[in-house]
Amino acid sequence: MKVKKLSGKVQDAQQIPTLFDNENITYHPINIVNWKEYPYQPQVSFRIAYTNDAILVHYKVVEDSVRAKYGEDNGSVWTDSCVEFFSIPAGDGIYYNLECNCIATILLAAGSERNLSLIHI
């Protein structure tokens, strides 16, 4: 997959879908279930681009039902209906984990793959 670089800055996350539409950034499906014990598979796709100072990701999710229990950042959002983004952008072994539930509560952590520390937002 080739990730497109966009010029300029995004001032508000709500601008991302329109910006991606205008730049013809396409959706990519996520159609793999990694855990046998959790066979449920919602319909998920994403599109991604970057700027000089940001990685921009837009998810589209269709589920049978949703859960949104956690409203405080760095809470247990992974137990809610959520999406995740993992990256090692500098190739230095520092692994970033970003999780967001369906009410925009964020969990952000960084570190080695087995030793993540929360980043206060």
Task: Specify the residue positions occupied by each region the protein language model found.
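Surface-exposed, glycine/proline- and aromatic-rich loop segments on solvent-exposed faces
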Residues: 27, 33-112
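Conserved small/polar residues in nucleotide/adenosyl-binding loops
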Residues: 119-121
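Polar/acidic, low-complexity leader/linker segments enriched in S/T/G and N/D
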Residues: 1-24
